[in-house]
Amino acid sequence: VIRLDKVYRQSSGSRIALNARLIRHGNLNLEYGTDFRFIDSADLTESAKLMEEQYLREVKKYGVDRVALLSPFRQKTETCVNALNETLRGLVNPPSASKNETIGGKKNLRVGDKVMANKNNGDVSNGDIGYIKEIDYDGEDVIVYVDFGDGRIREFGKEELDMLELGYATTVHKSQGSEYDSVIINLQKAHSIMLTRPLVYTAITRGKKEVIIVGDRRALC
């Protein structure tokens, strides 16, 4: 039996690794510093604004592909994944005359968007992140070209667009198996039904260099 005792995602001495161990064992006396911060805000509207500000700051530092905003819920509040994605997309990939968009229908996508696959499709797996490189129109159909990296450029027609969603913010569940230089975590009492200790542990351990929690300290499990 091989036992792995060393944490490789975070550096030695990382508060992220330390606090993850504490949370796993039910100890909420966390250690804060430059690599692990908590920004107090019990108000959802204020929290959404704070997360947007932190996201922009972290993207400038690490790049949009190395930063994730994690939230327990996909919808229902101002700090849910769907609402945050729309706002973040407007901040980092605003519309312009040079960027084609999908027009009409329920799925609005834009050239330059960071997107996530939500279904397995050939060599593209559920949860894979890509970037929209081109949007073409073929009669009444629209073709969206997504670069998932490693030479995987895939085409999605109008009837396949539901297989894509914006990927600036994502649920903690969807983030499992991924890692980022910086993660911003939405932690609110309004989401308490979802805030289990394993979920908080999973969210924290997605970060390699920085973890920023925004929300209500009372929501910590």
Give short role names for the model-derived ranges:
Residues 128-139, 143-221:
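C-terminal accessory regions
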Residues 1-122, 133:
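Conserved helicase motor core of P-loop NTPases
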